[in-house]
Amino acid sequence: MLKSTLRLSRISLRRGFTTIDCLRQQNSDIDKIILNPIKLAQGSNSDRGQTSKSKTDNADILSMEIPVDMMQSAGRINKRELLSEAEIARSSVENAQMRFNSGKSIIVNKNNPAESFKRLNRIMFENNIPGDKRSQRFYMKPGKVAELKRSQRHRKEFMMGFKRLIEIVKDAKRKGY
């Protein structure tokens, strides 16, 4: 039984190594293209039997386009290097608008700081940031935390029942009882 388990692990290891070798081979091809596209193109010209190098050949080699995706996947180029400053600013604003609101910062639109402060204040209270700040200010022992949670849960249930009773009384009063 131990022998068969050992064989299975060897087979799975061999499969793992073959996939790693394939990935290494693909990455090495990408590295060759990115690191020295001119030499790669010259090597392909020599394979065809063309040994003469003219200005047009060099211009063709220099104008070779390497796909940006290939360069990004190899980690050789950053997308921000290809964008202009205006495009970077526009994309950062769009990304900021799509991010989740943590309640710490906002974007000031239309040069209106008063509106922005109101929005920041609303977001902070929606996320209960002042309450979290108060509750996290001092250390509380685990027993005290459990007691506080139990008290808050009881208060919440009591208030729900009390509000329901008030609604019943209002309804009865409206009906004339």
Swiss-Prot record:
<comment type="subunit">
    <text>Component of the mitochondrial small ribosomal subunit (mt-SSU). Mature yeast 74S mitochondrial ribosomes consist of a small (37S) and a large (54S) subunit. The 37S small subunit contains a 15S ribosomal RNA (15S mt-rRNA) and 34 different proteins. The 54S large subunit contains a 21S rRNA (21S mt-rRNA) and 46 different proteins.</text>
</comment>
<keyword id="KW-0687">Ribonucleoprotein</keyword>
<dbReference type="GO" id="GO:0005763">
    <property type="term" value="C:mitochondrial small ribosomal subunit"/>
</dbReference>
<dbReference type="InterPro" id="IPR052837">
    <property type="entry name" value="Mitoribosomal_bS21"/>
</dbReference>
<dbReference type="GO" id="GO:0005743">
    <property type="term" value="C:mitochondrial inner membrane"/>
</dbReference>
<dbReference type="GO" id="GO:0003735">
    <property type="term" value="F:structural constituent of ribosome"/>
</dbReference>
<feature type="transit peptide" description="Mitochondrion">
    <location>
        <begin position="1"/>
        <end position="17"/>
    </location>
</feature>
<comment type="function">
    <text>Component of the mitochondrial ribosome (mitoribosome), a dedicated translation machinery responsible for the synthesis of mitochondrial genome-encoded proteins, including at least some of the essential transmembrane subunits of the mitochondrial respiratory chain. The mitoribosomes are attached to the mitochondrial inner membrane and translation products are cotranslationally integrated into the membrane.</text>
</comment>
<protein>
    <recommendedName>
        <fullName>Small ribosomal subunit protein bS21m</fullName>
    </recommendedName>
</protein>
<comment type="similarity">
    <text>Belongs to the bacterial ribosomal protein bS21 family.</text>
</comment>
<keyword id="KW-0809">Transit peptide</keyword>
<dbReference type="InterPro" id="IPR001911">
    <property type="entry name" value="Ribosomal_bS21"/>
</dbReference>
<dbReference type="GO" id="GO:0032543">
    <property type="term" value="P:mitochondrial translation"/>
</dbReference>
<dbReference type="GO" id="GO:0005739">
    <property type="term" value="C:mitochondrion"/>
</dbReference>
<keyword id="KW-0496">Mitochondrion</keyword>
<dbReference type="GO" id="GO:0070124">
    <property type="term" value="P:mitochondrial translational initiation"/>
</dbReference>
<keyword id="KW-0689">Ribosomal protein</keyword>
<dbReference type="Pfam" id="PF01165">
    <property type="entry name" value="Ribosomal_S21"/>
</dbReference>
